[in-house]
Amino acid sequence: MAEKMGILGRKIGVTRIFASDGSAVAVTVIKAGPCPVTQVKTVATDGYDAIQIAFDEAKEKHLNKPEIGHLAKAGKGLFRTLREIRLEAPAAYEVGSELDVTLFATGDRVKVSGTSIGKGYQGVMRRWNFAGSKDTHGCEKVHRSGGSIGNNTFPGHVFKGKKMAGHWGNESVTVLNLEVVDVRPEDNVILVKGSVPGPKNGLVMVRKQ
């Protein structure tokens, strides 16, 4: 399925700017691009239409020989991260061309994908917002437990998807319908209203919606 065009970037942090009416607007600063096109895929050669973009310059010692050879074809240097974007008309892009923040304009709506902050192993009260058990009156050693996880003989197993303690965070998250507040091509920066997933300096993909 074809996607809207986008670029890779890094989440710099959160700040606020002031609108023309004097109101404060919380924004996330994303340093995005420039992202060179390293490969153009078509139905004839690869079975589907897409372009591959690169981001985050890297040293040769951090890449293997196949990666170095592949990036050399684009002639734009070495990069740490590669991503594909499926498009309906990839022929409009050439290997070696660059994508930058001028893809976006103030007022555009975008979706931002990233990896959420990992919280480690957490109990049900923090992970799923369970209320927990009573503090007193017959309750012993199970104040923060999740309670029963199923019946006995029937069904005889725990249903898939049951909310229990476990690893929380460090998973792919996409936030939709974020407004582009400002675009600053001279700094390769876009300002997006609201929050985006991931820690500071985390890798994100910003796509048109």
Swiss-Prot record:
Single GO term (MF): structural constituent of ribosome
Keyword set includes RNA-binding: yes
InterPro entries, per database record: Ribosomal_uL3, Ribosomal_uL3_bac/org-type, Transl_B-barrel_sf
Gene3D superfamilies referenced in this protein's UniProt entry, alphabetically: 3.30.160.810, Translation factors
GO BP field: translation
One family name in Pfam for this protein: Ribosomal_L3
Keywords: Ribonucleoprotein, Ribosomal protein, RNA-binding, rRNA-binding
Function of the molecule: One of the primary rRNA binding proteins, it binds directly near the 3'-end of the 23S rRNA, where it nucleates assembly of the 50S subunit.
Family statement drawn from the similarity comment of this UniProt entry: Belongs to the universal ribosomal protein uL3 family.
Protein name: Large ribosomal subunit protein uL3
Organism: Nitratidesulfovibrio vulgaris (strain ATCC 29579 / DSM 644 / CCUG 34227 / NCIMB 8303 / VKM B-1760 / Hildenborough) (Desulfovibrio vulgaris)
